[in-house]
């Protein structure tokens, strides 16, 4: 089993361009697994962890409701935002500057074949990262992602998640609000969940801006420990 994970920082990149990039890696990995099974070979698959910041964009998962986008195409353009229907799980979410967006493209045959465990460990990596900033975050029953003050009228989401998997290969991932402009969430019903607020790390800490690279380093440390991975930086 290959537990090496190649970490790639893509910088600020258009959503569609990044999605295509993910799809190419995903397809190569799935195709190699099919070839190995068909030909009886054991060529190792590779694992990747992509990090990116997107320009303002809304994405709707395959089980989502387009009615959860609350603005018109004209209003989208006025806000310099785009909209895509995509092939991950979940409903609608927002990506933009000030978020850490992570796309692990892993062959879970290299780790464990359990999608539920995969999602819970991704959540745990975020929870442990936020705890380093003194924030107590947690899961909300039946709602994937990471939240604060669950079970109270003040419950708010700080990290959204939505993934796709085929033949135990994953793509898509999570978006952690660090310095994000939360006003963009007013244009959607985030994750299709009415009456729940969103927040970001800088708002919770009362700081103007938090270093994204520092947060990413902490997150990768916890990911490495939880997945027992070997990180390789590109």
From Swiss-Prot:
Superkingdom of origin: Bacteria
Site (Lowers pKa of active site Cys): 157
Gene3D superfamilies hit by this protein: Bira Bifunctional Protein, Domain 2
Main location: cytoplasm
UniProt keyword Cytoplasm, yes or no: yes
Keywords tagged on the record: Acyltransferase, Cytoplasm, Transferase
Leader sequence residues: none
Residue intervals of the BPL/LPL catalytic domain: 43-231
GO-annotated biological processes: protein modification process
GO molecular function, one term: lipoyl(octanoyl) transferase activity
EC number: 2.3.1.181
Pfam assignment, any one: LplA-B_cat
Active site: 191
CDD domains assigned: LipB
Catalytic function, reaction form: octanoyl-[ACP] + L-lysyl-[protein] = N(6)-octanoyl-L-lysyl-[protein] + holo-[ACP] + H(+)
Pathway the protein acts in: Protein modification; protein lipoylation via endogenous pathway; protein N(6)-(lipoyl)lysine from octanoyl-[acyl-carrier-protein]: step 1/2
Subcellular location: Cytoplasm
Residues annotated for substrate binding in this entry: 88-95, 160-162, 173-175
Remaining remarks: In the reaction, the free carboxyl group of octanoic acid is attached via an amide linkage to the epsilon-amino group of a specific lysine residue of lipoyl domains of lipoate-dependent enzymes.
PANTHER family reported in the protein's UniProt record: OCTANOYLTRANSFERASE
Family membership: Belongs to the LipB family.
Function: Catalyzes the transfer of endogenously produced octanoic acid from octanoyl-acyl-carrier-protein onto the lipoyl domains of lipoate-dependent enzymes. Lipoyl-ACP can also act as a substrate although octanoyl-ACP is likely to be the physiological substrate.
Protein name: Octanoyltransferase
Phylogenetic lineage: Bacteria, Pseudomonadati, Bacteroidota, Flavobacteriia, Flavobacteriales
